């Protein structure tokens, strides 16, 4: 992954350490976006205490650089994006930058379901990244039960390997 990806989404310190070790072996520093769970229970650190614990440990991983925070909503736990749960990323970025000296610039506010907040002009300032692959590739926002204008919905089928799994 380190060889091919220019950044990765991470949730577990064990995986972050392994990524760091791989990056060091390759003479690289691999950028990571730390995922924060805001209630959907799909992925990410859960709660400020767990976030602080993992942030301190990331400082000891020389092969990675924490460049962003992200969240995923509208998936497993049916939590939809809101001004409140996306604003959490802005608040946590400011906290981590201040307390730990990170220079977090990327705030990844979700998937195609977050587009609705953007379209309505309600996406909090500071959210500067959305992972809209489903929208681009499949032409849909499944949580809003809508098709995205101008996109095809039958372009291909996709298969992938699961590389991280955790029970919450």
Label the predicted regions.
Residues 1-91, 95, 99-100:
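Active-site-proximal beta-alpha core segment in soluble small-molecule metabolic enzymes
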Residues 14, 83-168:
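Active-site anion/phosphate-binding pocket segments in diverse small-molecule metabolic enzymes
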């Amino acid at each position: 992954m380190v060889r091919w990806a220019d950044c990765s989404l991470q949730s577990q310190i064990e995986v972050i350490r392994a990524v760091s070790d791989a990056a060091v072996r390759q003479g690289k520093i691999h950028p990571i976006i730390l995922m924060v769970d805001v209630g959907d229970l799909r992925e990410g650190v859960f709660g400020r205490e767990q976030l602080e614990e993992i942030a301190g440990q990331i400082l000891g991983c020389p092969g990675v650089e924490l460049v962003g925070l992200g969240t995923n909503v509208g998936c497993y736990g049916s939590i939809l994006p809101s001004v409140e749960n996306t604003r959490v990323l802005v608040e946590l970025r400011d906290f981590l930058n201040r307390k730990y000296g990170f220079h977090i610039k990327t705030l990844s506010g979700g998937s195609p379901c977050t587009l609705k907040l953007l379209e309505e002009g309600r996406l909090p300032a500071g959210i500067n990244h959305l992972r809209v692959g489903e929208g681009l590739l499949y032409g849909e926002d499944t949580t809003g039960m809508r098709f995205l204008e101008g996109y095809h919905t039958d372009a291909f089928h996709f298969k992938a390997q699961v590389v991280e799994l955790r029970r919450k």
